[in-house]
Amino acid sequence: MAAQNEQRSERIKTTPYLEGDVLSSDSGPLLSVFALQEIMQKVRQVQADYMTATREVDFTVPDVQKILDDIKTLAAEQVYKIVKVPNILFRHIVMQSRDRVLRVDTYYEEMSQVGDVITEDEPEKFYSTIIKKVRFIRGKGSFILHDIPTRDHRGMEVAEPEVLGVEFKNVLPVLTAEHRAMIQNALDGSIIENGNVATRDVDVFIGACSEPIYRIYNRLQGYIEAVQLQELRNSIGWLERLGLRKRITYSQEVLTDFRRQDTIWVLALQLPVNPQVVWDVPRSSIANLIMNIATCLPTGEYIAPNPRISSITLTQRITTTGPFAILTGSTPTAQQLNDVRKIYLALMFPGQIILDLKIDPGERMDPAVRMVAGVVGHLLFTAGGRFTNLTQNMARQLDIALNDYLLYMYNTRVQVNYGPTGEPLDFQIGRNQYDCNVFRADFATGTGYNGWATIDVEYRDPAPYVHAQRYIRYCGIDSRELINPTTYGIGMTYHCYNEMLRMLVAAGKDSEAAYFRSMLPFHMVRFARINQIINEDLHSVFSLPDDMFNALLPDLIAGAHQNADPVVLDVSWISLWFAFNRSFEPTHRNEMLEIAPLIESVYASELSVMKVDMRHLSLMQRRFPDVLIQARPSHFWKAVLNDSPEAVKAVMNLSHSHNFINIRDMMRWVMLPSLQPSLKLVLEEEAWAAANDFEDLMLTDQVYMHRDMLPEPRLDDVERFRQEGFYYTNMLEAPPEIDRVVQYTYEIERLQANMGQFRAALRRIMDDDDWVRFGGVLRTVRVKFFDARPPDDILQGLPFSYDTNEKGGLSYATIKYATETTIFYQIYNAEFSNTPDSLVLINPTYTMTKVFINKRIVERVRVGQILAVLNRRFVAYKGKMRIMDITQSLKMGTKLAAPTV
C-alpha cells in the first residue's frame, strides 16, 4: 500500500504554489512534431486535390529531431583538409627515350572522369555534371599545408620531393647519371623560406599546381591570412547580446588561448545570420515555423489551478445547474488534450497559427459546453488590433456562445433591452444596463478580446535579430518582469478581464464572476510565461519578420494571400475550457537553445551556396544553347537539390512544399541578392570563377570530324626512333584553318537527312580533306593513354550519332551531336629486333575525330624541363603551430535557469 501511495505521489506533481495535477510534459522537438502533424493535416487538404491530377508524393511526417542532428553534424564538417603534402598534380609517362618524357597534368586527367556523359535531351544530367565538376575543383583546392616534410642540406632547410606536387620517381631509373645529378641539384635548390603571415611564422616554398586548383588554394589562404578578427568580434558581441535576451551565458573557454603566437585559427561561419537568406526560400513559412518550435520552445508541463478555486465559487452548492459548475468535474480525453496543445501553440505563435472550431455535432448540441467556451474564449484569445489567434468564423461563434450564456437565466432573471440589429451581443443587460455590444469581435480595434484597449505589441530596445524587433505583451504584461508565482498576478488586471467581470455581475452571474476573480492571478501567470517564452526563447532567425507579421491580420481580413499565410488548426469547443484551466509551465529550456545560432548559420550558409550554384546554372542555357535545347529552370533547381546536403533539403521541405514550387518562385529566389557569408560560400564562388572557362571542366565545343591517317613510321634507325619519343594524338595544337571548316548546325543536318544525303555530303567533305564542326554543343572529354594501337571504337569513332529506321513506310533519322569524345595518346615502342616495316600495315588506319583544347594537358618535354612547372608559391604552417577551427566556439554556452523556475 505504501508503495502504491509512493508511485501515486510520483505521478502527481504539483508546483510550490499550486496543487493541481500535472497533465503532461512537452518538449520543443516533440511539440514541433505534433505541430507538424497538425499543420500537415491542414496542408494536405489543399494539396490533395492538386496531387490527384499529378504524381504521387510521399507525405510521411519527417523526423525533426533527426534533421537537427544532421545539421549539427553538418556544422562539424570542415570544408578544407589539413595535409602534410599536396596532391600530385603532374605525373610523367616514361617512353623509350632517355631524354624525353610525357608530362601529364593530372588535374585535367581526373576532371575528365568526373560526371556523366552530356547529351542534348537530358539537361538535368548536364546541370548535375557541371555541379560535380565545380565541387571537384573546390574539394581538390581546399587544403591547408601543415608540418610539411623537409630535410637539411648544407645548413639549409629543403623541401622533400613529394611536397613539390610533381611525380618523377618513375623517370629516374631510365635517366643517365648526368640527368639524375641535374635533377638532384634542382631539388636541393627547393629551399624553404621563413615567412610571416598574420604575425605567425610560416614556411614558404615554390611548388607545382594547376591553375584552377591553385585559385581555390590561394583564396582559402587569403581567407585565413585576412584573420577574420573583426568578424569574430562581431560574432561574439552579437552572441552576448543574444545571451542577454535569451538568458544564456556564452562561454569563451574555447577562445582563451587562440590568440597565442603558436595558433592559427579559422572561422568558417559568421554570426549574426542574415534572416533574408532564410525567409527568401520559396514557400518556407511553415518549415521555418516548425524549426522555430523545434530549436527554441522549452519543455513544459500543463498544470491545473488550485481545485479549491472552483469548489468555493462554482460548486459550493449541493445542487449546481450552471454551465460552469457542470463542466468543473469533467476530465479531458487524449484528443481534447491535443486540442489544448494546439491552443497553446497558437498563443505562442500569434498570427502564424490561428484557431478555428471543429465541426462536431455532439458538442454543438451541448449548450453548456458552448456557453462556457464563449466566456473563456474572450479571455484566452486576441482578435484584432495588431494580431489574432482566431479566425473570423471562430470569433463570431464565440460571440454567439457568449450571447447565449448571458441570456441563460438559470439563477435570477435580469432585465435585457435588445438592440435593433439582431447581431450577437446587441443588447443591454442588468440593472445598470451594461452594453454587451463591446464584447462583439472587431478585428480592426480588438474590442471584446484580450487585445482590447491594451498595447500588446511594442518596439523598444533593438533586438539581436534585426528582422524581428517586436515584443509581444499579452494582457499588457511586460516580459522583463520576474515572475514569483506565489505573489505574481495578485492585484494585476487588464481591461478585457475587468469588463468581463462587470458584465457577469450585471447579468447576475455572481458565482462565475467570483470564480474568474479568483482565477485572475493564475491567468496572469499563464500569459506572463507565454510572453517570456515568445520574447526570449522563441526569438530566432526563424521568427516571422515584422513586415510579414504586421501584414497577417490585414491580409486575413481582406482575404489576401501572401508568402506567409497563417496556419489554421481546428479545436473543439470543450478544449477551450480545458485550456483555460491549464497553464503551460516551462520546466526545462530547449536543449538546442545555445547551439541554435550555429544551426541557423549552417543552414543559411548552405542556402547561400545553393543560390550561387543556381545563379550560375541559370546562365548556362544562354551560354550553351545547343546542349540545353529542352532545358527548363526546374531542371537546374532539381540538380542543385540533388547535390545539396540531405539535412538542408529536409529543412526546406519540412511541409513537402518542394512538390508545389513553381518557376516563378524559383527564379525570384535565385535573383534575390541576400547571401550569408561563410568560408564555404567564398570557396564556392571562387570555384565557379575558375569554372567559367569550361575547358577547365574538360568540356569543349571544338570537336571536329576529319579523316587523318594513323602514322606508321618506318624503323630505319631504331635507336634514333626511340630517342625521339614518338607518339600520336588526336589533340590539335591549334584549330584548323577557318576556310576549311564546314559548320554543321542542326538545321543543315535535318535538311540533308530529310533529303537522304547526310552521309554523302559528309563523305564529299572528307574526300576534299576538309573539316566539319557539328554545332556549338559542349561535349564530355575523356583522356586515355595507350602503349599499343587504340581500339577501333576510339580510332574510328565519329563526333555524332546517326541512326535510321523505317516504320510504316516512312524513314526516320535520329541525330545527336553531344557524344562522349576521347582524347587519346598512342605511344610508339620499338625493339631492336624490329624490321623497318614492323609498324606498317597494308591498309592504312584512319582516325575521324579531332579535338582542340587551349590547355596544356599533355606535352613532351626534355628531362631538364621536368621541374619547370615549379612556379607556384605555397605557404605551409610549421609543425609546432596549431591550426584551430574556432567555429564551434559559436555554440558554447550555458543556459541560465529562469529566476523562478
From Swiss-Prot:
Role according to the record: The VP3 protein is one of the five proteins (with VP1, VP4, VP6 and VP7) which form the inner capsid of the virus.
Gene Ontology CC: virion component
Protein localization: Virion
Family: Belongs to the orbivirus VP3 family.
Recorded superkingdom: Viruses
Keywords carried by this UniProt record: Virion
Pfam families: Orbi_VP3
Predominant subcellular localization, coarse grouping: virion
GO molecular function: structural molecule activity
Protein name: Core protein VP3
